[in-house]
């Protein structure tokens, strides 16, 4: 799928090129700690987890409980998974290739 051309510009290219230069998990932490607030990082991480849970077949109720994401955010991410540019699916697929259990529904243990 095509990327929205309204996003393509020199500043976005520069950011993405910088991200592509990161060589380790530690470098990612260092860079993103500098470039994002903790809240922004939590929001980005939460969106990826919502996408993973949707792709795994989790239901909205479980996703809300685990991530704290609103149903509006979950719906938007689901729309992106189904009709977006394919970025979520591409990354989730690659992560699942490295970890066969990545897209399994992870049930919380009840006390």
What are the functions of these language-model segments?
Residues 44-58:
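Short, amphipathic alpha-helical "recognition" segments used to contact nucleic acids or chromatin
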Residues 26-46:
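Short, Lys/Arg-enriched anionic-surface-contact patches
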Residues 62-67, 74:
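Short alpha-helical "recognition helix" segments of helix-turn-helix
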Residues 11-15, 31, 49, 73:
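A general alpha-helix detector
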Residues 91-111:
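Intrinsically disordered, low-complexity basic tails/linkers immediately adjacent to helix-turn-helix/homeobox/MYB/SANT
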Residues 1-22:
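General nucleic-acid-binding
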Residues 79-94:
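Short, solvent-exposed alpha-helical "recognition" segments
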């Amino acid at each position: 799928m095509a990327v929205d051309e309204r996003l393509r510009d020199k500043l976005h290219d520069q950011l993405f090129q910088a991200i592509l230069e990161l060589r380790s998990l530690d470098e990612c932490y260092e860079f993103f700690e500098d470039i994002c607030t903790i809240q922004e990082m939590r929001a980005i991480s939460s969106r990826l987890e919502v996408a993973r849970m949707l792709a795994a077949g989790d239901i909205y109720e479980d996703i809300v409980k685990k991530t704290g994401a609103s149903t509006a955010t979950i719906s938007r991410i689901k729309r992106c998974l189904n009709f977006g540019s394919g970025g979520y699916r591409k990354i989730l697929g690659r992560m699942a290739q490295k970890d066969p259990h990545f897209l399994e529904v992870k049930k919380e243990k009840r006390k």
